[in-house]
């Protein structure tokens, strides 16, 4: 039976702990840089926390489950996640990106990625014909929906059909709706981006970023890159984000209720 997202937010952690960690409700913080082994040639599966850490892996399993992906990777910030994602592309590749994006993403694309030879076309993806901007060297479409800051909404499913037709990756920043209200992978996206600093964390006390995918080839590439670049999220920050996720449902419901009330007030007063 499929689980409701509220159940995933809370009980995935409890079930794993009941088997492996003495029944503790909260997953332990493995604040260790290195790990001992039983003997020569015998490994616990953990060597060095830049490569793998149990607390980080547990958080990644949770986020992958929330987004219905096969793998999620936790980063030190949302921009660290996007920066690593750009390593999928090489000089001469072209990306179509939404005209309204988070300022940090625009800065990365315009001042770092372009310097490295990647080309961009900025398109209002919520209203323009994206297919008209596809070139021979186009490799991906990158959007936010809703966008930051203008809250433009793009039809992910329709855009996914265009991307698949032209063999392009569809990358969706899902920060503003969170997995509680939207699952881009279910609508045809290949990669989901999150700033965990926002709704996933929810307490304004830590930075985090995530990449989620439902493709084995992309997962393998991301795993190689995160081990190589050392951009993984620290154990204590993983604990804080995991704590925040437990209340994701109630927080998102309240945010939605507040937004509806604000909309009613604006319409009632005639303020525009």
Report residues per predicted region.
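Short, basic and Ser/Thr-rich N-terminal targeting/leader segments
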Residues: 3, 24-25, 57, 68, ...
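N-terminal "arm"/small-domain region of PLP-dependent enzymes with the aminotransferase-like
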Residues: 1-53, 59-62
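Conserved N-terminal alpha-helix of the aminotransferase class I/II PLP-enzyme fold
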Residues: 34-83, 87-88, 104-111
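Conserved PLP-enzyme active-site core in the AAT-like
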Residues: 17-18, 72-271
């Amino acid at each position: 039976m499929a689980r409701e997202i509220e159940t995933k937010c809370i009980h995935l952690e409890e079930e794993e702990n009941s088997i492996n960690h003495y029944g503790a409700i909260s997953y332990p913080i493995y604040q260790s840089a290195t790990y001992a082994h039983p003997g020569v040639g015998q490994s616990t599966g953990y060597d060095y926390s830049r490569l793998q850490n149990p607390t980080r892996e547990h958080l990644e399993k949770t986020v992958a489950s929330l987004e219905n992906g096969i793998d999620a990777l936790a980063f030190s910030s949302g921009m660290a996640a996007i920066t690593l994602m750009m390593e999928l592309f090489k000089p001469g590749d072209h990306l179509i990106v939404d005209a309204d994006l988070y300022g940090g993403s625009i800065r990365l694309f315009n001042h770092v990625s372009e310097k490295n030879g990647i080309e961009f076309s900025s398109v209002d993806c919520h209203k323009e014909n994206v297919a008209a901007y596809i070139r021979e060297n186009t490799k991906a479409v990158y959007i936010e929906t809703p966008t930051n800051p203008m809250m433009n909404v793009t039809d992910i499913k329709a855009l996914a059909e265009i991307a698949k037709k032209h063999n392009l990756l569809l990358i969706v920043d899902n920060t503003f709706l969170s997995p509680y209200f939207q699952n881009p992978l279910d609508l045809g996206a290949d990669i989901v981006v999150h700033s965990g600093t926002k709704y996933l964390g929810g307490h304004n006390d830590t930075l985090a970023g995530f990449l989620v995918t439902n493709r084995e080839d992309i997962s393998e590439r991301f795993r190689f890159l995160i081990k190589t670049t050392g951009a993984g999220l620290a154990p204590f920050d993983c604990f804080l984000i995991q704590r925040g996720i437990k209340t994701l449902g109630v927080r998102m419901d309240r945010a939605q209720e507040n937004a509806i009330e604000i909309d009613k007030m604006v319409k009632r007063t005639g303020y525009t």
